Regions:
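Short, surface-exposed alpha-helical segments at coil->helix boundaries
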Residues: 2-5, 56, 241-244
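ATP-binding pocket architecture of kinase catalytic cores
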Residues: 18-146, 186
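Active-site acidic catalytic loop and adjacent metal/ATP-binding pocket
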Residues: 29-33, 40, 173-226
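An alpha-helical support segment within catalytic cores of ATP-dependent transferases
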Residues: 2-15, 79-82, 95, 105-117, ...
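Nucleotide-sugar-dependent glycosyltransferase catalytic core
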Residues: 48, 144-152, 226-233
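Helix-rich C-terminal or lid/interface subdomains of diverse kinases
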Residues: 114-117, 221, 229-302
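Short beta-strand segments
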Residues: 41-43, 75-76, 191-194, 213-214, ...
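Short helix-capping segments at alpha-helix termini
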Residues: 64-69, 166, 250-255
Length: 302
């Protein structure tokens, strides 16, 4: 803890530190909040650090087309002036709390409608950024068929002793149907947030609206439907469909099968990724709980 505090003091000598909070829950970064005003993100690995300048460029682009929703305004800090990879980034804290399901269920109809509009507007603004522009910036295409096949292989390996042959077969069909769907799809790739879950959607309790979207560290070029996966997983079908219906009226390209890709596969993506993460980080309790959830889903799909 002291090493981060020490570094911040050295990098910003004029900053008086009155309060210091450290959050190590993130998969990619350790977050440090200073004076309830500045949020510093220290990447856990070099590969995450390399993404920070891209994240900054994307947020700058997005800020031009967003009125109500804030995105981080990044400042980058380097260990040495000659370095090209930042040691960390920081931005003025966007106040709000993660949009939990409990918050959504307590909203009045009018408030809920306003939030749905905000989310649809944000996703459309992101997905409408010209592909040529983000390709030039250097955003990668990551969630290819190869990526999903590797994910499938890992799941088969990690779950082999916990699944019956019927469950293994159901998991196989889930993936094979998705691969067949992608093979016949003609959707257009866009820039995607790729980690659009309640953790990264900030809600302002006072005015009952979305105050900001954060953590663009996984941003990449990919299937726009993937950005609805977290919404579906966190808030369910009705909410996600409402966001999609508004989104489809403002998005620049027509994609009639987008909702099908969400309901048939992407809605399970957060759970599948959690299973792998919890196995690899040896979190047995969460791994078992997630595996039981997947078993119930596969049984329901038979």
């Amino acid at each position: 803890m002291d090493s981060y505090k020490q570094y911040i003091k050295q990098a910003l000598p004029n900053l008086s530190i009155h309060s210091y909070k450290q959050n190590e829950e993130g998969w990619d970064n350790i977050a440090v909040i200073i004076n309830d005003d500045l949020l510093f993100r220290f990447p856990r690995k070099q590969e995450y650090a390399k993404r920070i300048p891209l994240e900054k460029k994307l947020c700058t682009l997005l800020s031009h087309s967003l009125q109500e929703i804030e995105v981080p305004k990044y400042h980058l800090l380097y260990k040495k002036d000659t370095d090209t990879i930042p040691l960390c980034s920081y931005y003025t804290l966007i106040h709000g709390e993660p949009l939990q399901k409990e918050i959504v269920t307590t909203l009045e109809k009018k408030e809920l409608k306003a939030i749905i509009t905000q989310l649809a507007t944000f996703l459309a603004a992101l997905h409408n950024i010209p592909l040529k522009q983000v390709t030039t910036l250097g955003f990668p295409i990551e969630k290819t068929i190869t990526y999903w096949k590797e994910l499938q292989t890992k799941l088969n390996q990690y779950l082999t002793n916990m699944f019956t042959s019927l469950q293994k077969s159901a998991l196989h069909h889930l993936f094979e149907n998705f691969f067949a769907c992608i093979a016949t799809s003609t959707f257009q790739n866009t820039i995607i947030h790729a980690d659009f879950t309640h953790h990264h959607i900030l809600f302002n309790k006072q005015n009952k609206s979305i105050s900001g979207i954060i953590d663009f560290g996984d941003a990449q070029i990919g299937d726009p439907a993937f950005d609805f996966a977290g919404l579906y997983y966190d808030f369910g079908r009705e909410f996600t469909t409402s966001v999609y219906e508004q989104y489809s009226t403002i998005i620049s390209h027509h994609d009639p099968l987008l909702i099908h890709r969400i309901t048939s596969f992407y809605q399970y993506s957060p759970l599948l990724h959690n299973i792998i993460y919890n196995f690899e980080t040896k979190n047995a309790l969460k791994f078992i709980a997630d595996t039981e959830q997947l078993k119930a889903i596969l049984q329901g799909r038979d």
